[in-house]
Amino acid sequence: SANTDEILDILKENNIKATFFIIKRDDPESIARMKRMYDEGHTVAMHTVSHEYPLVYADLPAYKEDVDGIKTFIDDTLGIDCKFYRFPGGSSNTIYKHYGISDIHECIDYLDSRGIKYFDWNISNSDSENKKYSPAELAANVEEYIGDTGVYNVLQHDAPAKKNTVQSLQIIIDDLKAKGYTFCQIT
């Protein structure tokens, strides 16, 4: 979305590289944004083709098709061998149980067989919740769980409705830099 452009601008101004877990969008604007991410040194990683839980987790063949689809899309678009992935709903989700997958380890085994490493977040700004948080509240949601030391993967979204996430980003960056944190992407 246009929010992605603003996020990329903020990251560039702060000389920060990030990881973007991609949902397949094959329109020209989305492809240009994904190429910009990659060209500016960010890690482009797999998320899902559809983000529709009933489709992704219908059964193991459907899950494999989703993973293969997003991998092929990223690999072919960027000319890379994408090896990083984030589960729709996270790897500890129980959403898959409502559909055809009985054990998330079946999915993990498939990723392992493809040489794909999955990542989860350990802090969220809570922008995926139904509540509409202000930019300051989103930043506070992150800062509440940041300790004095540690490695954190912060979950934030760039969908069109996530304007407050964009507006919270500089607050989060400034606060974490003041605490001595550095930023890096998954590599």
State the predicted function of each range.
Residues E52-L78, N93-V151, N164-Q167:
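Alpha-helical scaffold elements lining the catalytic groove of polysaccharide deacetylases
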Residues D9-N15, D26-E29, A161-T187:
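C-terminal domain-boundary segment and adjacent tail
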Residues A18-I22, T43-T48, K83-F87, K117-N122, ...:
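Structural recognition of the beta-strand scaffold that forms the well-ordered cores
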Residues G89-N93, P160:
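Short, internal active-site loops enriched in acidic
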Residues N14, E40-G41, R114, D148-T149, ...:
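Structured helix-beta-strand junction loops
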Residues F87-P88, Q170:
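Proline-centered helix-kink/hinge sites
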Residues S1-C82, D175:
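Active-site beta->alpha N-cap acidic-glycine motif
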